Amino acid sequence: MSLLHIAVLLPLIFALIIPFVYRFYKRIHLGWFVLPIPVVLFIYFLSYISTTMSGNTIMEKANWMPHFGMNFNLYVDGLGLLFSLLITGIGCLIVLYSISYLSRQEQLGHFYCYLLLFMGAMLGLVLSDNLIILYLFWELTSFSSFLLISFWRDKQASIYGAQKSMLVTVFGGLSLLGGIILLSIAGGTTSIQELINNASEIQTSPFFIFSMILVLIGAMTKSAQFPFYVWLPDAMEAPTPVSAYLHSATMVKAGLYLVARMTPIFAVSQGWIWTVTAVGLITLFWASLNATKQQDLKGILAFSTVSQLGMIMAMLGVGAVSFHFEGAESQIYIAAFTAAIFHLINHATFKGALFMITGAVDHSTGTRDVKKLGGLLTIMPISFTITLITSLSMAGIPPFNGFLSKEKFLESMIEVTNVNLFSLDTLGILIPITAIIGSVFTFVYSIRFIGQIFLGSYKEDKLPKKAHEVSPLMLISPSILAILVIVFGLFPAILSGSIIEPAVNAIGQTTNSTAEFHMFHGFTPAFFSTLGIYIVGIVLIITFSYWIYLLQKQPTKLTINYWYNKFGDVTPRYSSKFTDTYVTGFTRNNLVIIFASLIVIALVTLLVTPFNIDFKDVSAIRPFELIIVVLIITAASMIIFAKSRLFSIIMASAVGYSVAIFFIFFGAPDLALTQFVVESISTALFLLCFYHLPNLNRHKETRSFKLVNIVISVGAGIVVTVLGLIAYGNRHFGSIAEFYKTHVYDLAHGTNMVNVILVDFRGTDTLFESSVLGIAGLGVYTMIKLRAKNDKSDEGGKNVEQTEE
């Protein structure tokens, strides 16, 4: 195991340790103990920049379950390193921010355990080269995010938001699992890099389209794309550090990472290009439109996050066009990848800061309701400055980093209309139109976000508590991000060669991509589009009160959230009715369903699959064997017609003893002896127990009841017999008995094969069987003791009553 493996597992290890630290040492805020972990990891991953800048990659392998294609292989390239730096870098700032946000009275041991669990899961997800391991970390992010969102579990809204996020993302995870299975079948491997190298082979597979659809569903649920975005707004009930971490820089970017990583495999399909682009643009438009009507600051940021994720998704879709061209023409569309990666970084900076400032405002005023806020400019000047910088960046206004990536976004959306491929030159006109409209509403909610908090009149009477500027410690993290917004806007070359180009090369499978960003490109279509966005946006802000009521009057039934809740209400009711049709509470009915299903499956398989029953190696039936079989059949048949329990027990014992005689004739005396002992003890116990039971009252079953029993019994007997004969006559592998014959002495140092198998070769199985018997015995002992205790209590109660009388 390499140092890279340790780096990925480090947060998971400390997630187990931190709760114990909190339990025994509470004098210092637990966050100070956690902070060094992401700091050390961030510094460690910075050391890989020189490697990825030179075009090299690193593969660290660790065998886990190679026979199942599950090896813990980690792969560091430009894309994985970018996400690792975001996860650990933003993680440092989040932990620092949480120290001032969460008081010591909170369950900090739980919080930081969940946070580190999530951090480790995200690192494993973005660095794993094995699809199965990636999926395990993918689901671990869903699980840990559920714990984080429901951290304040005394609030019903937190539980609701956590459940919704869990249901939607786990649904996507199951879809992703299906896609992974089909993809690994098509490519013959679970290694992502090997799959990329075998992309041409996968693209001719009949599983190609199905795996693509399933992978996209998984990615879109995780990154809150339309129509799966419904979980993200309700997830805002989490503590602000969680929202700032999960929903600005990490979890919601996991779907984008998956799309970027899978692009070299699926980019050949026009379905991939159109779906990723269209879904991204629809998400951008719909979420930005909904963000304008939100009354909660976190609600605004939630929908703005969804819209920004849609924007990045659309850029990844357009960038996939580059796989259909070569040379300079390909570089035109690779620029969309460049814009996507740059905006991925930019979004983490300005959105992370805005979430933290929202938490600061809530911490200061006691509310996030925009109707109660306003006029905080003079009261919270530092918070205002940070909000101004980051909101203008989100709006796409120079000289901030958001402007540069937004310009690249518009250029890519306009440029793709020139592609004579997949009808992009005709239907593609909708792409820049949708992008521009979505950008207009992005401008509107970004600018209004500033005014709703800090401008206007101060409404002291509406605030739960007197507003004040928050502590310097709470402002350090958003201040750092605000500074980065300015630095990356004025000096984008800091990121170009070191971070962006290696990441773009990893997505586009190239080595010569260039990332150049300029504040002014000339009088281009993108420039005029930006001017139009500003002008229309300002007009909409001025006339906001005249048109917003139209959005607020949107019928509830036209929202996806309404149908999600409807489905959640209806499903348990109808599923309960359906379950009641076959779960009746009677063991016999359950067994009928189980055996009937097995019989039907087996018979259908036998009918559609050719098989052969070979009797050539079957030994002759000896007379005494025939006699024993007749005895077994006779005894078993008589149990059916028995009129007393005693007779049934005797006949069942006769069957067992007859089978034991078989064991003797077939050379297994120890097994026969064991069978004799078991039968004798069982018979004695049954007789002792049934002696104390009331007489057997027979009741007449209906004819249909008996008929079903007969059909199931005969069917099960036929199926087992036929399958046994088929298995005997079709031996594709050597008998395992030869292994035991060869190694029973030299490996286990025993001469009795049956005993050696039970005690040595299958020792663990025997141990657990013994454990089951022990647990059953403890259960019986407990029931007897409880009954005796209750009997004594009843007697004591009677004595008390008599005394009182």
Swiss-Prot record:
InterPro entries: CPA3_Na-H_Antiporter_A, MrpA/MnhA1/PhaAB, MrpA_C/MbhD, MrpA_C/MbhE, ND/Mrp_TM, Proton_antipo_N
Localization of this protein: Cell membrane
UniProt keyword annotations, A-Z: Antiport, Cell membrane, Hydrogen ion transport, Ion transport, Membrane, Sodium, Sodium transport, Transmembrane, Transmembrane helix, Transport
Transmembrane residue ranges: 1-21, 30-50, 79-99, 117-137, 166-186, 201-221, 226-246, 265-285, 300-320, 337-357, 377-397, 427-447, 480-500, 531-551, 591-611, 623-643, 646-666, 671-691, 707-727, 766-786
Pfam family, one: MbhE
Membrane-protein topology: Multi-pass membrane protein
GO molecular function annotation: antiporter activity
Chief localization: membrane
GO biological processes: proton transmembrane transport; sodium ion transport
GO cellular component: plasma membrane
Subunit structure, as described in the record: May form a heterooligomeric complex that consists of seven subunits: mnhA1, mnhB1, mnhC1, mnhD1, mnhE1, mnhF1 and mnhG1.
Alphabetical list of PANTHER family matching this protein: NA(+)/H(+) ANTIPORTER SUBUNIT (PTHR43373), NA(+)_H(+) ANTIPORTER SUBUNIT A (PTHR43373:SF1)
Function, as annotated: Mnh complex is a Na(+)/H(+) antiporter involved in Na(+) excretion.
Family per record: Belongs to the CPA3 antiporters (TC 2.A.63) subunit A family.
Name used for this protein in its record: Na(+)/H(+) antiporter subunit A1
Gene: mnhA1
